[in-house]
Design a protein with these regions (language model features):
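Extracellular/surface-associated beta-sandwich interaction domains
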Residues: 17-616
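Bacterial Sec-dependent N-terminal signal peptides
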Residues: 1-21
Length: 616
């Protein structure tokens, strides 16, 4: 009977879960020097109609706001039921406009069950049940829908659903919510043949905000996005973007903002007119406050591509593998009988075959590619297809940076422009590089790719909590959470950031407010997130920016993870130093000391003295 109840709870969640505006809620992150309002449909920042909202205030309680509104974008290329190739960009409901059909928002909406229905607030780790304080605001749900499958403690009632595991509160503040694109009925497309009421692309997005008041992370607000393809169709081409409305200098001083990017550190940032980037001096805020700092948004973890055969993030340099050269981009000719590499695009498995005497046909999704013998072929960038039949996908990807209007600098992404040394790849003819676990590493493969799982600390079982005696605890091998709704053990797959072959920052577009892309223009948004295009040719104006990472495929039932840091600095060196520091912290799975919990203190007044007591 218990087993039947567990199955009912679990499957009822899967069947009935869908986003709705009725589940909208908000809260405020204020766990370090940054304070900002956020909403559980993806908006970070403020609505002008909500006077209590705060948009990226730094330092906390200063009244100095740098961010108006921020939203994440997820673009997908697909074929509709009429066979037409379409682009969908799923957006957040926000003050810059939204895609609406009468009163229905065609975009992200929150799932029910992740907040306390008796409050209008998003669940946060420090706002749980507190029986000692009747006025305390309790934001947690009675149980968590995504942990209903835990056989020992279904739904984790009374426990925090933490990134690090059950009731693990590593951060000063952690928020958690889940949303989907169920209501996005814009296109003639049905992502789930078993549920024709579901629209959109069949995407579900779980989001966490994290803050530490540790000195190394006190100027950073972390945002983690887990985007899962819950449809029964593969999505062959996707891109993830972030659109940022800046008000550097505060309200009334946003008309003279500047913005730039740093490709090496995967960061985009804004600053006030007159600011000297080295010293941070010169900028003046709306009410005369000075200096005005720099606000940055950075990829700490960008989308990964574990299928292209390339070490996208450059972490495989000490292992086996040849390096990419420009000679690989030259046209090639295959005669009948020559060995070529073909890819099964449903699994991305490679096979060596002899080129046929007549023609070679390869299918990818709804596309059919036909190759003839003795005809020149060459790689086509950014189509996520192996055009030259060597098993490597898009090895000739490039980037074009518009330095000033009409003036561009071009370079290849996978070859260092100064040294000429390329990234490593797998040679599918010889097998060289196939044993390098950091080429095409993945957080979905059940493998400790970087070898950092520690049996003395990490063998805590599937729920991530030591002492619960759950599956995998103290069994001497890493236990991955892949294929479950549970986190798994530290330093493997879900809980190990380094196990992702990250693409990094692939585009940046700085545009005047009012003439930039609208949230209901899918094609324009898709075009502005074109990988390889970097534009910051306008400055000293009221402008916003859009940056992105792509392209990558997302197979059905798989999850792609992203992490964005909102961070601040007194000047550009300070901002980049903060980025590099928190990148190290992130790569080490936030492994740094957390401040001790504050004790409860009470006093007893005597004759001419006061005695203080506190708990331990």
């Amino acid at each position: 009977m218990i087993r039947q109840v567990l199955l009912y709870i679990f499957f009822s969640h899967l069947i009935f879960a869908k986003g709705s505006e009725l589940s909208r809620a908000k809260n405020t992150h204020s766990g370090n020097k940054i304070r900002s309002t956020f909403y559980n449909y993806g908006l970070v920042g403020r609505w002008s109609s909500e006077p209590e909202d705060i948009g990226g205030e730094w330092p906390i309680n200063s009244g100095h706001e740098y961010i108006g509104d921020v939203g994440h974008l997820v673009g997908s290329e697909f074929q509709n039921l009429d066979g037409q190739l379409k682009k969908s960009v799923t957006t957040v409901y926000g003050p810059r406009g939204s895609e609406m059909n009468q009163d229905i928002h065609w975009g992200w909406e929150p799932l029910s069950g992740y907040t306390n229905p008796d409050t209008p607030l998003v669940a946060m780790s420090h706002m749980g049940p507190n029986e000692d304080d009747p006025d305390y605001i309790h934001t947690w749900p009675n149980s968590w829908p995504d942990t209903a499958s835990d056989p020992i403690d279904p739904g984790w009632p009374g426990s925090w659903n933490g990134y690090f595991g059950k009731n693990q509160k590593n951060a000063e503040q952690e928020s958690y919510f889940v949303m989907d694109d169920y209501n996005d009925a814009e296109f003639n497309y049905f992502p789930d043949s078993l549920n024709l009421e579901r629209r959109g692309m069949g995407l579900e997005c779980a989001i966490r905000g994290l803050q530490w008041n540790h000195i190394l992370a006190e100027d950073v607000l972390f945002w983690l996005y887990d985007i899962k393809n819950i449809s029964n169709k593969n999505i062959d081409k996707m891109v993830f973007g972030y659109i940022v409305g800046t008000i550097t200098g505060g309200d009334g001083d946003s008309q003279d903002d500047w913005a730039d990017f740093d490709k090496i550190d995967d960061i985009a940032f804004s600053y006030d007119n007159g600011t000297d980037l080295e010293s941070g001096l010169g900028g003046i805020g709306a009410s005369g406050w000075s200096p005005v700092g720099l606000a940055g948004y950075a990829f700490l973890e960008s989308p990964g591509n574990p299928y292209d055969g390339i070490d996208n993030d450059g972490d495989a340099s000490f292992g086996s593998g040849n390096t990419i050269t420009t000679q690989m981009f030259e046209p090639v000719i295959f005669s009948p009988g020559d060995t070529v590499v073909i890819i099964d695009y449903t699994t991305y498995e490679r096979t060596l075959i002899a080129f046929p005497s007549d023609s070679l046909t390869i299918t990818k999704g709804n596309d059919i590619f036909v190759f003839k013998p003795n005809q020149p072929i060459e790689e086509i960038a950014r189509n996520l297809f192996d055009d030259n039949l060597n098993g490597i996908i898009d090895e000739n990807n490039g980037a074009s940076i518009e330095i000033t209007p009409g003036f561009f600098e071009d370079y290849y992404l996978y070859i260092d422009s100064e040294s000429g040394v390329g990234l490593k790849y797998i040679d599918y003819y010889s097998g060289i590089g196939s044993d390098n676990l950091l080429i095409d590493e993945s957080r979905l493969d059940g493998v400790d790719n970087d070898g950092d799982w520690d049996i003395t600390k990490d063998d805590v079982g599937l729920d991530g909590l030591a002492g619960s005696n759950d599956f995998g605890e103290n069994d001497g091998i890493p236990t991955s959470g892949v294929g479950t709704d549970l986190p798994g053990e530290p330093n493997i797959d879900k809980t190990d950031i380094d196990e992702s072959d990250q693409i990094g920052l692939s585009s940046f577009y700085y545009f005047n407010f009012g003439v930039g892309p609208q949230m209901n223009d899918d094609n324009r948004l898709w075009d502005e997130m074109l990988p390889g295009y970097f534009n910051n040719s306008i400055q000293n104006t009221d402008a916003d920016f859009l940056f992105s990472s792509g392209y990558f495929p997302l197979l059905r039932e798989q999850t792609e993870r992203f992490s964005i840091a909102l961070l601040f600095g007194d000047n550009l060196p300070d901002l980049l130093r903060n980025k590099q520091t928190v990148q190290t912290i992130y790569n080490q799975n936030y492994n740094f000391a957390k401040a001790p919990d504050l004790p409860k203190v009470w006093a007893f007044a005597g004759d001419g003295y006061v005695t203080l007591y506190w708990d331990d």
